[in-house]
Amino acid sequence: SGILNPVTKIDILKETPTTAVLDANDGMGMVASKKAMDMCIEKAHKYGMQVILDVVFNHTAEGNEKGPIFSFKGFDNRIYYMLTPEGWYYNFSGCGNTLNCNHPVVQQLILECLRYWTIEYHVDGFRFDLASILTRDEKGTPMADPPLLQAIACDAILGKVKLIAEAWDAGGLYQVGSFPSWNRWSEWNGRYRDDIRQFLKGTDGMAGTAITRITGSKDLYPEPRGDSASVNFVTCHDGFTLYDLYAYNTKHNEKNGWNNTDGDNNGNSWNCGAEGETDDPQIEGLRRRMVKNAFATLLCSRGPAMFYGGDEFCNTQFGNNNAYCQDIIISWLDWTRQE
């Protein structure tokens, strides 16, 4: 049965794949009409849900400098991308290229995009993927006061929307607790995730650190920012699901095609006595208690709580902690697990 059953009672979510705003049999899928998107957001608002749009302004699909031309490379390569003196792409995104976000042209593009979603679709906020890239200048150097982030924070149209940063990038820049905020930006608290995972699995010496995280991470978010700047989470779309966190000691990404070399190798997981699916009722019972422990800790912590869709009914990705590339049962929500 589900851990948080009420979360699963919204019919439109049960009928909607996570990769589309319409029913999968509709024929339009991810390229649904504006009307359908409006309807989806309106329905969410009717149920008292706010809609936070995940936006990726850190790279495009063109890969590295040897990749194809899909979008901005053909317009003005030097304006839209961070380039080395030799003309190669800086790769702070892990995807082969990095968008030159603080160039005035790119900055204006991003601002207009955010305004459009706010005005036309009435989204309630934005979560910025690998947001530390948005703090870098054209050479990749982090800036104390990035013009793009300041412009977003001070924009009149965006003044009431929520701004949430994934405060790190694939180039090693980690800004949890130090992301430029103008008292507007919240952050995914990656320290909360890592420390609470270790505490819950029984790692020695973590009790004091866990108390700090549960009580609002004041070491990271002192006033005036405070605990409202800390988006607490134990799991997200990157990494193990919450059930898998207590069902697998190691990742199992073999079906991704990279010989299990992709994905995080340090998930602080614990399989509770058996690797993967098991019929042992004691092990399965322990796993469900651990999931409940994680939810109880998360929901009793100071600051906004976030959990991964499906964790409330112990959804599994069968040990795959990098399932973005899978469109099979590995990445699907199995609603029968709430029964």
Q: What are these model-predicted stretches?
A:
Residues S1-H122, L130-C154, L173:
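Substrate-binding/active-site clefts of carbohydrate-active enzymes
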Residues A44, D54, W117, F128, ...:
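Conserved, mostly hydrophobic/aromatic
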Residues H122, E138-K139, M143-G309, Y324-Q326:
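Conserved alpha/beta catalytic core and glycan-binding cleft of carbohydrate-active enzymes
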Residues G319, A323-S331:
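Aromatic-rich peripheral "rim/lid" segments of glycoside hydrolase catalytic domains that contact
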Residues D23, G96-L99, S132-I133, C272-E284, ...:
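Glycine- and acidic
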Residues Y308-F313, Q317:
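Short acidic/histidine-rich active-site segments
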Residues S71-P85, W185-R197, I328-W335:
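Acidic, His- and aromatic-enriched active-site or binding-groove loops in soluble protein domains
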Residues A20, T336-E339:
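Short, intrinsically disordered, charge-balanced linker/junction segments flanking boundaries
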